[in-house]
Amino acid sequence: GYTPDEFWSIANRFGFENRMDGLLAYMYTMIEECRKKGIRLSRDYLVSCGRAIELFPGVSDWFSRINAFGETQGVEIEHYVLSSGLREIIEGSGVSHEFKEIYACEFFYNEQGLASWPKLDVNFTNKTQFVYRINKGILDVAKDKELNASMPDDSKRIPFTNMIYIGDGLSDVPCMKMMRAYGGQAVAVYQDSNRAGVEDLLAKGRVDFIFPADYRDGTLFDTTMKNIVRKMAIADALAEENQQQLRALGRGELPQQMGLLGW
């Protein structure tokens, strides 16, 4: 076998020498190196590798807690993964059932059940297409025509203003910038090893907030996420009231109201 550093050295060198997308390079390297060493690179094998993932504090019950909080605000919360890692490994992590959809790199498996080709590649910039998929409610990656078709804003399933993007590195920057540009919220979490880089994201206006990667109840991260959900719920209620009044005005049905006067 190889240490992680040795594997990435091989994959990165192969990608550089062949002017290849870095993620496709590492997926190809996995297939080739497993073939050379007689390792069955099957879906089950990769899923089993995911069982060794150590989750950040509080992640295991984060989803049920924030979902329950959303219900108190009249909000239904959905969770998605956009990752440059392997979908199969994420599926083995123990929390994959919490996600409505997982968008991550994935292999195609041949008749022998072995990985033979990259099925999906989620790199730095094409992560944004999956945000659009969530926005429009077109989750099937094979439906490119439907994704690119024009859709009125009021027909889009999840407005950008109702999205929170949580990331931890440079591969998330395009989506973070997209969130901020379209009225959503961008949040970065950090460990000691990447704190400086995450602080730079905040300093350069690429994210709204940064927090230690601690999802436990009562942490500043947890409290801020709840405040953002509250804000989104209030904004939706105000927007709906505005639309109701406009519709009533068009029908000549707007009731007499006492308003606040500015002076």
Go through the PLM ranges and name each one.
Residues E91-S93, G113-A115, C175-M178:
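A short secondary-structure junction signal
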Residues K127-S171:
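Conserved Lys-Pro-Asp/Glu-containing loop-to-beta segment of HAD-superfamily phosphomonoesterases
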Residues A68-I77, K156-T161, A181-G183:
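Short, surface-exposed connector motifs at secondary-structure boundaries
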